[in-house]
Structure formats: C-alpha cells, structure tokens
From Swiss-Prot:
One of its GO terms (biological process) is defense response to bacterium. Its main location: secreted. It is found in: Secreted; Target cell membrane. Keywords: Amidation, Antibiotic, Antimicrobial, G-protein coupled receptor impairing toxin, Immunity, Innate immunity, Mast cell degranulation, Membrane, Secreted, Target cell membrane, Target membrane, Toxin. The modification Isoleucine amide is found at I14. It comes from the Eukaryota. Linear cationic alpha-helical peptide that acts as antimicrobial peptide. Has antibacterial activities against both Gram-positive and Gram-negative strains. Has no activity against the yeast C.albicans. Shows moderate mast cell degranulation, as well as leishmanicidal activities (IC(50)=36 uM). Has no hemolytic activity. Its mast cell degranulation activity may be related to the activation of G-protein coupled receptors in mast cells as well as interaction with other proteins located in cell endosomal membranes in the mast cells. Expressed by the venom gland. This is Eumenine mastoparan-EM2. It comes from Eumenes micado (Potter wasp). The lineage of its organism: Eukaryota, Metazoa, Ecdysozoa, Arthropoda, Hexapoda. Belongs to the MCD family. Mastoparan subfamily. GO terms for cellular component: extracellular region; membrane; other organism cell membrane. One of its GO terms (molecular function) is toxin activity.
Amino acid sequence: LKLLGIVKKVLGAI
C-alpha cells in the first residue's frame, strides 16, 4: 500500500 499516495490524495481533497 502506498501511504504517501493516500496522503497526497487527502491533501489534494482538502
């Protein structure tokens, strides 16, 4: 799992 990818998606969603 790419945690960094998930974090980036969350940051982009904010």
